[in-house]
């Protein structure tokens, strides 16, 4: 007796662009689709429809998003667009009129509904067959995960359009955040990377109201959240920390080993004049004093930051002020961007002199050379010391991992020459044998 084979599950291709916050959005959409019986495939040719999660933070990111949308249309033909650039539906359709649907950031239900319209889910789908793990679908390696604690931002930095794309701050309930963190740890995650548009503002919008986790009260506030996360027994790393005064409360937690002594805090510039034009905190002298105090409390503290050079009105004097400030601050990990005007940003309306492109490039190169010397000198101090390393990759040559001062994708690596016996997700103590401006070399102890 012949039997009719069951129809195949509908298949979705997915391209995720932009920052870790967008990656978390992609994970949420994929989790919902997987729960409904969709298979996620890795090639355009195998997909019944392709979803592109776009980035719209700067013009180069928009250009990349439009290029990827075009590639997906060429290779597949059925394309749904979502994410930050989705707020510019007109611009997207002007370039790619054949896209099937366009939705903005955080519009998870609309994306899933758009997929339903193009490729309906199987009517006889049995959720017990296509089980989704409790932690959901993750696009990161199994041993680390991003934990998004809020959406949106209440600031009005003149170079940024995030509030217009993602709205005002909306903090997730603290119990929900901690439940997710606990599920991730139970699934094998060894490192939680706490992210949002403005991590240190967590709870401001709900006046730090008290929530509950595991039957105990917990305030919706950054310090209390970190205290609770520290009980899970994994690395907890903080990203996108705006320099509020209450950030000082986090440093003792780092000194006590409750969370990693790693602070990702974007200063953007040091010149008071430029910071004022950016609508950023302009207390560079107090910032230096705070950094000094933080390091006195927690000597192992690693500070990562990002800066913008070539902002409208930036003079050579302003730029030199920034270089001198970097010398004083002795930051560990630093990224730098040349200012790029973004459509809709308030900075476009400032009556300030535009910095020529060749001057921007020159300042960027000087900035990077200046900071590389600082970063290299600070890493040289690690030679001979023992560090704990979380392994990311292993091959016959050895292992590649990160220690507490390395976030994935953006910071350096630790190369373990005798680490071919290890596996991703292992934690191992090593002795540092060499260093350059970004990376360390070490041997297992």
From Swiss-Prot:
Its EC number is 2.8.4.4. GO terms for molecular function: 4 iron, 4 sulfur cluster binding; aspartic acid methylthiotransferase activity; metal ion binding; protein methylthiotransferase activity. It catalyses: L-aspartate(89)-[ribosomal protein uS12]-hydrogen + (sulfur carrier)-SH + AH2 + 2 S-adenosyl-L-methionine = 3-methylsulfanyl-L-aspartate(89)-[ribosomal protein uS12]-hydrogen + (sulfur carrier)-H + 5'-deoxyadenosine + L-methionine + A + S-adenosyl-L-homocysteine + 2 H(+). Keywords: 4Fe-4S, Cytoplasm, Iron, Iron-sulfur, Metal-binding, S-adenosyl-L-methionine, Transferase. [4Fe-4S] cluster 1 binds at residues 19, 55, 84. [4Fe-4S] cluster 2 binds at residues 153, 157, 160. SUPFAM superfamilies: Radical SAM enzymes. Belongs to the methylthiotransferase family. RimO subfamily. Catalyzes the methylthiolation of an aspartic acid residue of ribosomal protein uS12. This is Ribosomal protein uS12 methylthiotransferase RimO. It comes from Pseudomonas fluorescens (strain Pf0-1).
């Amino acid at each position: 007796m012949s039997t009719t084979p069951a129809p195949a599950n509908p298949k979705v291709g997915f391209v995720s662009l932009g920052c870790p916050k967008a990656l978390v959005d992609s994970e949420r959409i994929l989790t919902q689709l997987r729960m409904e019986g969709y298979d996620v495939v890795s090639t355009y040719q195998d997909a019944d429809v392709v979803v592109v999660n776009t980035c719209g933070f700067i013009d180069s990111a928009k250009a990349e998003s439009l290029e990827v949308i075009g590639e997906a249309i060429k290779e597949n033909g059925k394309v749904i667009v979502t994410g930050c650039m989705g707020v510019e539906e007109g611009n997207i359709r002007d370039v790619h009129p054949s896209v099937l649907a366009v939705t903005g950031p955080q519009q998870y239900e609309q994306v899933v509904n758009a997929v339903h319209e193009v490729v309906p889910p199987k009517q006889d789908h049995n959720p017990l067959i296509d089980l989704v793990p409790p932690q959901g679908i993750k696009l990161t390696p199994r041993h680390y995960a991003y934990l998004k604690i809020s959406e949106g931002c209440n600031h009005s930095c003149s170079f940024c359009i995030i509030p217009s794309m993602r709205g005002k701050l909306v903090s997730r309930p603290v119990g929900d955040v901690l439940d997710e963190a606990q599920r991730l740890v139970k699934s094998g995650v060894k490192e939680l990377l706490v992210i949002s548009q403005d991590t240190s503002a967590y709870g401001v919008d709900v006046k730090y109201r008290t929530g509950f986790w595991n039957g105990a009260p917990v305030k919706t506030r950054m310090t209390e959240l970190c205290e609770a996360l520290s009980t899970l027994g994994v690395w907890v790393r903080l990203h996108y920390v705006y320099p509020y005064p209450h950030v000082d409360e986090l440093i003792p937690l780092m000194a006590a080993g409750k969370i990693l002594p790693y602070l990702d805090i974007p200063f953007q510039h040091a010149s008071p004049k430029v910071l004022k034009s950016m609508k950023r905190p302009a207390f560079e002298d107090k910032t230096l004093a705070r950094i000094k105090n933080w390091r006195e409390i927690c000597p192992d503290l690693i500070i990562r930051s990002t800066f913008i050079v070539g902002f409208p009105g930036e003079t050579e004097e302003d730029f030199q002020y920034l270089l001198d400030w970097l010398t004083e601050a002795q930051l560990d990990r630093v990224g730098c961007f040349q200012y790029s005007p973004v459509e809709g940003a308030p900075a476009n309306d400032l009556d300030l002199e535009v910095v020529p492109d060749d001057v921007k490039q020159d300042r960027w190169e000087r900035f990077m050379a200046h900071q590389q010397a600082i970063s290299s000198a600070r890493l040289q101090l690690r030679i001979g010391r023992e560090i704990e390393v979380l392994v990311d990759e292993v091959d016959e040559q050895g292992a590649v991992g990160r220690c507490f001062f390395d976030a994935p994708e953006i910071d350096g690596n630790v190369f373990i020459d005798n680490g071919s016996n290890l596996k991703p997700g292992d934690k191992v103590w090593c002795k540092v044998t060499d260093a350059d401006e970004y990376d360390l070399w070490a041997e297992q102890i």
